[in-house]
């Protein structure tokens, strides 16, 4: 039940500091904000490593929470990319940023596995040291990033309230598509290792392969997603994302074996990609320039709060119910996505 607790704490740190990250960047700029996050994440990883050595569960969770704060800043990369291109190129810019995440499917697990024993007698403490070094690499590239942002002095009355932003059908459509895409994906992905390896006794190697291919499916479509959105429009791509999620749910109704888990998780990753990119790229069309940090921060607060809830509840759900039941619960989210998209159209 608590096997995914650390991941949930990271998500909590991420969602709780979304608005803070956006606010900081509105004051000091993108580059300074990203560098601050990079250094902070490195220190947080070292804290987590030290907590393993001294066997402090509280300190470990604090380190995970601060790592989540770094994630809150890093998710602003997609908005920074959008700001460097025309708005009609936003889907492609976001796709390129997400495509870079394909490396996480292979670099992350392998690096953690290779470095897990470099600190003798403290399994996985070395993995966090490796993470600390890895997070600093981005600082080198950020030194060459030309930030065109200037501190904003917009009067508060020039920006709409959160309620006014939500009242826009397009803004709400984008928000629901992105947040529920993350909710469904996180809810099912987090429960997969428990369902596969613990409950169905499928080998750890096969379980790991399913997760790796799932992550690849999350990011590889980014090669074409931007072009598809430009050709067919945001709403049609969202409907297609819902269809892909539906295949995942349908697969859960059959025997729970390696092949069916593989099919389900691949389509889960594909559906997330289409919904998240279309939702994020639609978001940038629904606010004014002076509202961007406010709208982006609010969007990410909702998206990753929902993700954190999904992550924390996944372990409980899979322990108390079943893989099939968890999939059926997700139908509710898909219906809401369809309704909000239809209403906006």
PLM region descriptions:
Residues 57-72, 260-274:
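Hydrophobic core of transmembrane alpha-helices in multi-pass small-molecule transporters
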Residues 145-176:
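Juxtamembrane intracellular "pre-TM" segments in multi-pass secondary transporters
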Residues 39-54, 244-256:
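C-terminal ends and interior cores of transmembrane alpha-helices
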Residues 61-99:
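Cytoplasmic helix-loop-helix junction between adjacent transmembrane helices
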Residues 17-30, 221-234, 318:
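Helix-to-loop junctions at the C-terminal end of transmembrane segments
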Residues 1, 190-206, 210:
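Short amphipathic helix-loop junctions that connect adjacent transmembrane helices
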Residues 92-110, 302-310:
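Glycine-rich segments within core transmembrane alpha-helices of 12-TM secondary carriers
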Residues 132-152, 340-344:
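C-terminal membrane-cytosol helix-exit motif in multi-pass small-molecule transporters
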